[in-house]
Amino acid sequence: MGFCRGLENNAAEGADGFKDFLQIIDELERLGAENDWCKEVGERLRKSKLYLKTTYRNHCKEDDSKCADHCRVFALSDAGDTDFQKICSHSHKVKCEDCEKLKNVLEEVKGAISEYTMQLGMFQAEDDLYEAKNAAAKIFEWRGHILRAENQDWYKRQIVDTLKRDETFIIVDWTMKFIAMKFWEKQVE
């Protein structure tokens, strides 16, 4: 059961985040970073993007996931505000290999920027680190949106599954529109 939601902005921003990281890798390669390392990191970035586009949502379907990155209850709770927290009845001791690979490759690129500060120059290195942090934020915001969308779909399925024969479930969403999947683009520029 797929429900319409404003995915195009988040997906486009997340894809831009990956593109920004790939551009930083290209810049580091021009400055002397090893070609093999650049290719390998670029491939890891592409695999991480594919993971978010395809598999991550399926990992978030479990109601009581032992992985903090997949547990809807834990991941959607606000650690800083008790009004927006829900306590899980299980621990989160499992780490997802794909989620860890994503975090590691982003940190590795940030570390490489720091290593090439002399070649980049202080101001360019600061700019690249700023770009990398913003790109990572876009990627994790996209990941969060996927998790929220799965949570929303889960609750909608629960409602639909419990409807009685004489009941109706209506979704009113004033922002719904037809979006061609091939042309997902940002709405704001």
Predicted feature locations:
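Extended mixed-charge, aromatic/glycine-enriched low-complexity segments
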Residues: M1-E189
